[in-house]
Regions:
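Terminal, non-globular segments
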Residues: 175, 181-184
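Short glycine-/aliphatic-rich beta-strand segments at the starts of folded cytosolic domains
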Residues: 130-145, 175
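Structural motif
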Residues: 27, 54-56, 94-97, 138
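N-terminal positively charged helical leader segments and presequences
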Residues: 169-170
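Active-site beta-strand/loop microenvironment that shapes enzyme catalytic pockets
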Residues: 79-127
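C-terminal regulatory domains involved in ligand/effector binding and gene-expression control
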Residues: 1-78, 164, 198-200
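Short amphipathic alpha-helix segments
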Residues: 141-159
Length: 200
């Protein structure tokens, strides 16, 4: 089972490539869902309303199973696909790359466009800081208040992040744990009395 993936740490904006008078302005955004994707696309479109094309590609999901390449009016396969191929080449996911083109008066032809969009995506991703993220899941644990030391020790041993702690007589914790530690945590919790847990 896969426990981690590569993505970019933060957005990269306004990389510039000039090709026969045309300008290609590159952007890369970390995106985790459709909403973030939409926001990033709208942001770039609103910043460049007069651009000739806003071409983009994205990959989302652990194995990049959710993906799209959009030519935005350029000849089919000449823009979105070369951008998408750069995401594959860098082995990253949960990333959107946009290349905004301002037409400069000289036609580049399909092979020229492929080369330019590939290069625009490449220089944009070369500026990004590529990081490895570990997959996480949320766990909610209910336990007797006098067991809190045991629970906190267990979570800290596996590097969990506490999101919320409610210390009633029956205490509850919401925590983020790394999926690679899930089985060990489940085993330890199952061995404790008066403890219930569920995954969100």
């Amino acid at each position: 089972m896969q426990f981690e993936y590569k993505t970019i740490e933060k957005p990269v904006e306004n990389t510039l490539l000039k090709e026969k008078g045309s300008k290609f302005i590159g952007f890369a955004f970390p995106v985790n869902n459709e909403e973030e994707l939409k926001k990033a696309l709208e942001k770039v479109r609103s910043e460049h309303p007069k651009a000739t094309h806003h071409c983009y590609a994205f990959r989302m999901g652990l194995n990049g199973e959710n993906y799209r390449a959009n030519d935005d009016g350029e000849p089919s396969g000449s823009a979105g696909l070369p951008i998408y191929n750069q995401l594959l080449a860098h082995e990253i996911t949960n990333v959107l790359v946009i290349s905004v083109r301002y037409y400069g008066g000289t036609k580049l032809g399909v092979s020229g466009l492929v080369k330019a969009y590939k290069e625009s995506a490449k220089i944009t991703l070369e500026e990004a800081n590529i990081i490895t993220k570990e997959l996480e899941t949320e766990i909610e644990i209910l336990f007797n208040f006098n067991q809190q030391n045991i629970i906190f020790t267990l979570l800290s041993k596996y590097d969990a992040k506490i999101i919320n702690f409610d210390s009633q007589e029956k205490a509850s914790i919401l925590a983020k744990i790394k999926i690679k530690h899930k089985d060990e945590i489940v085993e330890s919790l199952t061995n404790l009395q008066f403890v219930e847990f569920s995954f969100n």
